[in-house]
Structures are given as structure tokens and as C-alpha cells.
Amino acid sequence: MENQNYPGVFVRVKAVITDSVILLIFMLGIVALFDRFENVPDIARIAAFVFIFLLYDPLFTSIFGGTIGHFLLGIRVKPANNPHKNILFPLAVFRYIIKALLGWLSLITVGGNKTGKAIHDMAVQSIVVFKNQTETL
């Protein structure tokens, strides 16, 4: 993996912005759906909130190798030691928590290392790669 070209900050920021739009669409869809019903149980509202704000990133990252924003931009999140697999769900949750807590600060290390790892990638030993590069490894 040493000869690869890794996604830089700009590509990763575009993925975050894309995911923000996707989450907004999810929220609007859920609100529209709930508006069709007279009495929506609080548990349904809580479950929708948890999925949208807490589980979207870790679930998609652990199951599909990235969020919808990652897919649209052709990047994937993989374990640094095995780019053919997806990171485990508990690691994806921890990665997301660090990313959410640090916000944009987490990306300051992307340009400073040869594999383009953000702080949240370093914490869980993940790496962000271009999709076509995972197919050739």
C-alpha cells in the first residue's frame, strides 16, 4: 500500500458535505413520514434520531466500507492492515465518536503523513483509500 495515492483533505471534506446533505434529506423524509401519522410514538422519533445522528456513519462504514458520501466520491474506509475488509462496527463507532468530538480538527493530520490518516483513522488503525485501489491490491 506504500505506492498508493491517498485521498486528501479536499476529497474527504467533499464526502462530509455530501453526507451532510444526505442526512438533511433523511431528516426531511422522516419528518414528512411522521407528519402523515397523527400519533407517532416517542420511541419511533428517538429511533429515527439515533439512526440519523449516531448510527448512519458507523453502520455504513462497517457494512459497506463507507458512507454514501464516500461512495459517491469513490473512497472507502478500510482497516490499515487489510484493505479488502471493512472495519468492525465497534471500531467504526469509536472512529465516529472521535471524528464527531474533534470535528474539523481531526483532519489536520491528513496532509502531514504519507497515508493521509486523520486523527480518527489513527485511533482505530483505519485508512481511507480510493475504491479502485482496493480492487487492485
What are these regions (language model features)?
Residues 1-137:
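Membrane-interfacial and juxtamembrane segments of integral membrane proteins
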